[in-house]
UniProtKB/Swiss-Prot annotation:
It comes from Streptomyces coelicolor (strain ATCC BAA-471 / A3(2) / M145). Stealth proteins are part of a protein family that is conserved from bacteria to higher eukaryotes. Family members were first identified in microbes as proteins that help pathogens to elude the host innate immune system. Microbial stealth proteins are involved in the biosynthesis of exopolysaccharides. Stealth proteins are predicted to function as hexose-1-phosphoryltransferases. It holds the Pfam family Stealth_CR2. GO terms for molecular function: glycosyltransferase activity; transferase activity, transferring phosphorus-containing groups. Its EC number is 2.7.-.-. GO terms for biological process: polysaccharide biosynthetic process. Belongs to the stealth family. This is Exopolysaccharide phosphotransferase SCO2592. InterPro entries: Glyco_trans_1 (IPR001296), Stealth (IPR047141), Stealth_CR1 (IPR031358), Stealth_CR2 (IPR021520), Stealth_CR3 (IPR031357), Stealth_CR4 (IPR031356). Keywords: Exopolysaccharide synthesis, Transferase.
Amino acid sequence: MKITFLLTWGDEMGGTEQAVYTQATHLAPRHDIEVLSVFKTREQPFFSVDERVSVRYLVDRTGKTERPVRESDLTAEDCRHLAGLPSDLISPKWEATFDALSDVEMQRALRTIDTDVLITTSPALMSAVADLAPSRVITIQQEHRPSQLRGGTGEPLLLRAPAIDALVVLTERTKQWLEESLGKAAPRLAAIPNAIPEGFRPRSSLTGKTIVMPRRLVPDKQVDHAIQAFAKALPDHPGWRLRIFGDGPQMSRLRNLIQGLGLHDSVELLGPSQHMTEEWARASLTILPSQDGEAFPLVLLEAFAAGVPAVAYDIVTGPAEIIRHGEDGLLVPPNDVESLAEAISRLMGDEALLRSYGEKAHEGSTRFAADVIVKQWEELFTELVSRRDDPRRMAERADRIAHRVAHGGAGRFHAAVAADRTAPSSGDQRAREVVIGASDRSLVRAGGRLSEVRDDLQGSEIVQRNFETVVEALESSGIPYVLLRDRDDNPRRRLAVDAAEQTRVRKALAGAYEGKAVYAELLKPRTHAPGVLLAERLEAVGEVAGLRVFRPVVTSTRTLRFGPAYGCDIEFWRQVPEEEGGDGQFVAPLRPSAVGPKLPSLTPDARTRVKDREYPTLEPLTRKLVSDITFPVDAVYTWVDDSDPRWQERRARRRAALGLEAESSGDEAARFRNRDELRYSLRSLAMFAPWIRKIYLVTDDQTPEWLNTEHEGIEVVSHRDIFTDQDCLPTFNSHSIESQLHHIDGLSEQFLYLNDDVFIGRPVGAQRFFLPNGASRFFWSPTTVPVGEPTEEDEGYFAAAKNNRALLEERFGVTVANSFVHAPHPLRRSVLESIEEDFPESVARTAATPMRGWQDISMVSSLHHHYGYLTGASVPSSIRCAYIDVGTYSRHPELTRLLAMRGHDVFCLGESQDAEVPEHEQARIVEAFLRAYFPVKSPYER
């Protein structure tokens, strides 16, 4: 069988290149193996190549001018010109190195390639092969990173994977994410890990008291965490050394850290080494403190092959697939330096345990031996090649592509499930879930766990349900607890329980929820691996700092999951005895409560109300704190239905009366376009900001047909009810309407103003928008307001910003430069009233301008914030915000990442005036995205 690997840079030093050459070497004895590299970048490849593996290049970059490797009539000038043009085959956002010359050479080579199996090694190359490879060639994408965490480079995966034969990833966790995200559009999916590189590997004696770390010195490898943890452990284990092999931009910073911690005699920064085999033979331990992003770290395989145990952060993918916690290494919670220090100290101080782990590590490395991994690949090749000429193969491919278009999204957007931070169930727990699922057919498997399907629960209801799940178990067993309070906007409930009751708590939960889809995430476990367990299995768990209990819920779309983030935390607070210097108080095991890291007692002496009942707490936790927000916060929307014939007629008459043509530069159709965003923006408030007291929908006597106008939490307000001068109506100028919002009857002093294309992206508290003293926050944008006076040629928002600037210069003697991000605007009625009093002519002129004009001011989206800042009523702040221009094709993949990561507080779906995406296509994309992000109806819908 002829097998071709396609690499971007086959000569370079990288994990992908190392893995490919290792795999090629292992396959070479039984197959015809070729490595096809798009670019030649060195005279000799960094990695040695087995003589049985042929290496071929397309474009030579070793000289002054990039040129084809083949014989060619192209002149040097031709080549320079082509190399300077962007690639049409591969988007620069996927991989910027490709150009027009590489396009020509890839098209020539791939359209006629003579091979049985073509394996791509990046999503960008996969996309090119999906377009270019002959139909009889089996196409496989080999993923070398965690797909669920990729940024722009991962865009082609969900878009183009349906057009290839197979997608192979390194871990089951990534495979599961692809299965759930692609659904019926998925090609053949497989999880096959990397193999240990060939070569003699001497065993370590583990007697050298040396921790070895080969790591690139870049931020995501978090080498500083290893140094800090080593510094904490070293005083109890003198004589140990930490040897770090690698280089990178963090070298100077790490040297300073080592000096600052006084570790210059114990920690060495040694640069890269070509002799790591010998270094592993002298090692006793290795540490892997990386951030999320590791796929399947070869460094752990190399350590295990030498019989060296490991301690690693339990990140999304990688370490947990290699390390068997408590057998050949230890896993600790990500970014927890204290736990990392405790784990390495445990092994540094126990020679017998270290040796036991070393034996198991060496034994366990056989799971990744070449013959084991090659067998999995060969079985996959055989399966796929056997169907090469089956007519159903191409029909199934067409069906997959159709499913992606029909159900996955539109254009360059593809709906994706959230990237879970905790590992899916496996082994005995997975087997037990099969039994539980068989007894309750309403449960489905989502996110690696049994889940209940619900489309009727808001986030706050999920939180309350998990809270009640815990309280029921504790109260049934007579276990006392105290309901805590937080200072931040954490949506979870927290319960404090005496650490002496931990065994009873675990037993109570295990008994109460035996055979149920109730789970607990282990918080800072002392001996057990981090992760999520069925509640019924908690009795076997050792000491933990806390438990996060939850009932998984997923919507029928499978795009919204409620997991541990909405759980209830049980924290085991320890009373420090006097002999240990304690004062009888209980100490927080994880983080402080609203009144600090200590509590005088865990005997409840007060009650606090949550929903419809009271719960035990402590009197200090019932007091009104200076950090509490106790004032009401409303929300205000302005909304237009541009498809309403009556509204269109009113607008046309108004324009005609003003002597205007059908359109003008100040009134772009995009500003009025209704794509049903309001429905989903209201869903975002209901789901993620349930503290909003009331919503006011300001319209030109329009009401969405789906709106539940009977709900007490929403009120439709006519322009006629807020304009003090009725002669200003009808108006079709958003600046005009916004200048009157503070006249809404019953509106709270503090309120949020939102356009219907602005959404809350995750749970946030009122503290995100206001200070407890009532001050409003605002969020500056890096975008600046152009210098100069406003003119009729200015875009409407810039003209208004310039007018705002002039007013502030006259009133306060200062010049403002920046605009604001597209986010909810935190406002105060009193500030808007003061603006109206201080600048009556400007406010009145704006109110009386029925179409956007160059003399407008923008009161709520700009002037309020600067005026409030200069009068002490507003403060600058920050918010995690995304702005996606849906009128630009290149921005659509950001919607997929937004959906998969759900990591932004707020986001806005805007549209530029010169949109390249047709209106109907924009509508499809917006609908597909919003339906996936906010699948749960709000109470404001009929």
